[in-house]
Regions:
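Short beta->alpha linker loops
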Residues: 35, 39, 64, 77-81, ...
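Active-site neighborhood of HAD-like aspartate-dependent phosphohydrolases
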Residues: 1-33
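Substrate-recognition "cap/lid" segment bordering the active-site pocket of phosphatases
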Residues: 75, 97, 103-154, 160-168
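Metal-dependent phosphoesterase signature
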Residues: 26, 46-84, 92
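Short glycine/proline-centered loop/turn elements that form peptide/ligand docking sites
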Residues: 83-88, 159-162
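Helix-loop "lid/cap" segments that line or gate small-molecule binding pockets
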Residues: 19-20, 39-54, 110, 142-143
Length: 171
């Protein structure tokens, strides 16, 4: 969702800067690459471990969500031609699921404001499955919710580890 349909990566880059700055750290050059395929919980654990924070993963996730909520609700836009493409797929009867690392509570207002929420038949977040996008769990669950086999699905993904994970499961 982020980076494929939504032009939202700038939000997460800014959250990384602000979040770590509040704790006296700069964002390491490899940080975004490391946490992107992880789900929220694993990213929070990684952040706590990497920076030696005395905080709970749930608290980091809550803070990140709070920082992102307004941007998603009011500022994040669709990528160029995404709306037209989704509407064309929907009109053709294609079932569409979103397999995302973002919380539904963040993306739903953005998709609704941009006029495409109703294009989706299912949403699966990495918080609902055991692993992040570096494993096929989120893609398999999306196919299951669409009542399709992996071979009947097409995955659009901008994370290399996610592409590899989906491919390993037969997508």
């Amino acid at each position: 969702m982020d980076g494929t349909l939504l032009d939202s990566m700038w939000v997460w880059r800014q959250i990384d800067v602000d979040f770590l700055d509040r704790r006296g750290f700069e964002v390491p050059s490899d940080y975004l690459e490391m946490i992107t395929p992880m789900g929220y919980y694993r990213a929070a654990e990684y952040t706590i471990e990497r920076f030696g924070l005395n905080e709970k993963p749930e608290d980091l996730i809550q803070e990140w969500h709070g920082m992102a909520a307004e941007a998603y609700a009011k500022k994040v836009e669709l990528k160029s031609h995404a709306k037209e493409y989704l509407l064309k797929l929907k009109k053709a009867g294609t079932r569409i699921a979103a397999a995302t690392s973002s919380a539904y509570e963040l993306i739903a207002p953005c998709l609704e404001r941009n006029g495409v929420l109703e294009c989706f038949d299912a949403f699966v977040t990495t918080m609902e499955v055991p692993h992040g996008k570096d494993f096929p769990d989120v893609y398999l669950e999306a196919a299951k919710r669409l009542k399709l086999s992996p071979e009947e699905c097409l995955v659009y993904e901008d994370i290399y580890k996610g592409i590899c994970a989906a491919k390993s499961a037969g997508f």
